[in-house]
Design a protein with these regions (language model features):
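Transmembrane helix-boundary motif of multi-pass solute transporters/channels
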Residues: 13-50, 237-243, 253-257, 261-262
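Select transmembrane alpha-helical segments in multipass membrane proteins
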Residues: 7-18, 43-46, 85-99, 147-153, ...
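Membrane-interface "cap" regions at the ends of multi-pass membrane proteins
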Residues: 1-29, 58-63, 67-80, 84-89, ...
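Loop-to-transmembrane helix boundary motifs in multi-pass membrane proteins
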Residues: 7, 13-15, 21, 147-148, ...
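C-terminal membrane-solvent junction of multi-pass transporters and transport-like membrane proteins
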Residues: 90-95, 340-352, 384-444
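Membrane-embedded translocation segments of transport machinery
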Residues: 4-8, 170, 174-322, 326, ...
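Inter-helical loop and helix-membrane interface segments of multi-pass membrane transporters/permeases
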Residues: 2-6, 34-38, 68-93, 106-166, ...
């Protein structure tokens, strides 16, 4: 039976959905920290350049494959490749990549909700630094707490996706993303009035090449390149699915620019929130979970109206994580529908059970299944799963999309250019072809190789 392809109701819906997928916790727990380490404004400048020459082109390619095929990532290549070609094998890998990402992202989204709840009801109020750190350890040690929030995330997200594309996912994500952007602005304005704001902002935004040389110029360039590449979550078809839901009114380069601008806005605004607070309370900038769950809660505990600001911050973090979960769930559910021909409701129900089961190792990896053998990856099941997605699926997947679009062995430059340029807006030009065909693939291979080197040999 031929199912009518669902479409998104509005252009804003498409842009916010795609941005929601790209905007994740990395924008907050990674970007400000490595920007501060890498020389502030100097790093930010390189980051922006890499976004334009690295992230942006690959995003247009993923969208083009989705929009031209009108299929989920698992079937998109089949619609576009020439007879006898094997590109569609990557379609199955995009689906595996999506499952792998959700195996740990649902847990991390659960952490955000748990902390929103704890802050909102005042469980972190009046604690000293050690007690705050203790709360995080306590959460990781409790399979029950983490399972509850993880299941909550999965159930809510599946219910939203099961309702349908326009009435479920698009409506909810639109509201969530607008709320996220507004909350960020309120938090940033609050930070800008703190006593340490001036110091914090100059550390974050004024180019400091001396600091950059301390870390090493090459290291800074590579981390700017990595961050620009990984922030957009390209390579597992998460963007491609939304390309398949839109019309041909606007060129894909123009739409991609808007999405990248939103992603960057969130990353930079996160720095505007975090640095003034750290400098005001004389706390070292940290990154990763310790920034979100230890450093910042300590600051909120000492701040006037800290409960309000802390609650708003964790609500924003929960939205950033949930928008990614919703986007990837949509992809998984749609792939399931196309592979089996079942309804949206049925695919949602099966995936509800499947994703909860697949997410359990990550939850248990911090307590009952903690095993020293994972130390090489960083120490927990989550780190192994994160390594597989970030170091294998994203760079290699992006490379496949890239080669598929620019080489004559795939879909080919002319087909890609025609699709990406259909509609009003910025166009991909022929002069870009040499760079996209010969230089960009080498950069992606470098990112892939460097990631492995960094993990196992550095």
């Amino acid at each position: 039976r031929i199912m009518e392809r669902e479409t998104l109701k509005s252009r804003l819906g498409f842009i916010l959905l795609s941005a929601g997928c790209a905007i994740g916790i990395g924008n907050v727990w990674k970007f400000p920290y490595i920007a501060g380490q890498g020389g502030g404004g100097a790093f930010v400048l390189f980051y922006l350049i890499f976004l334009v020459i690295l992230g942006l082109p690959i995003m247009t390619m993923e969208f083009a494959v989705g929009r031209a095929s009108r299929k989920s990532p698992v079937r998109a290549y089949q619609a576009l490749e020439k007879p006898g070609q094997k590109w569609h094998i990557h379609g199955y890998f995009t689906l595996i990549g999506c499952y792998l990402l959700m195996m740990f992202y649902t847990t991390v989204a659960g952490w955000m909700l748990h902390y929103f709840y704890m802050t909102a009801v005042g469980k972190l109020a009046g604690l000293n630094a050690e007690q705050v750190a203790g709360k995080f350890t306590e959460m990781l040690a409790s399979p029950a707490t983490m399972t509850f929030w993880m299941v909550f995330v999965v159930v809510v997200s599946i219910l939203v996706c099961a309702k349908g594309l326009q009435s479920g996912l698009e409506r909810v994500t639109k509201g969530m993303m607008i709320a996220l952007l507004l909350i960020m602005v309120v938090l940033a304005v609050n930070s800008l009035f703190m006593p340490g704001a001036k110091e914090g902002l100059s550390f974050f935004l004024v180019p400091d090449f001396a600091r950059m040389q301390e870390v090493g110029v090459v290291n800074t360039l590579v981390s700017a390149m990595n961050q620009a590449f990984f922030t957009l979550s390209l390579g597992i078809g998460a963007m491609s699915i939304f390309g398949s839901y839109i019309g041909k009114e606007h060129s894909l380069l123009g739409e991609s620019v808007r999405i990248v601008v939103l992603d960057t806005f969130v990353a930079i605004t996160a720095g505007l929130i975090i640095f003034p607070a750290c400098f005001t309370y004389h706390v070292d900038q940290t990154s990763g979970p310790s920034l979100i769950f230890i450093t910042l809660p300590n600051i909120f505990a000492n701040m006037s109206m800290g409960r309000l600001w802390g609650s708003l911050f964790f609500l924003f973090m929960a939205f950033a994580a949930m928008s990614t979960v919703l986007a990837v769930f949509e992809n998984i559910i749609c792939c399931g529908m196309e592979l089996t021909g079942c309804s949206r409701k049925k695919s949602s129900l099966v995936n509800l059970v499947l994703i909860i089961l697949l997410s359990m190792p990550c939850v248990l990896g911090y307590n009952l299944w903690a095993w020293d053998g994972f130390a090489v990856f960083g120490g927990a099941v989550l780190d192994v799963e994160d390594f597989l997605v970030s170091n294998l699926f994203l760079p290699l997947g992006s490379l496949v999309y890239l080669l598929f679009c620019v080489t004559r062995y795939g879909w080919g430059w002319q087909n890609y250019k025609k699709e990406v340029n259909t509609g009003k807006g910025l166009k991909v030009q022929d002069w870009m072809r040499g760079y996209l065909t010969y230089v960009l693939p080498l950069i992606v291979v470098f990112i892939f190789a460097f990631g492995l080197y960094d993990k196992f040999l550095a």
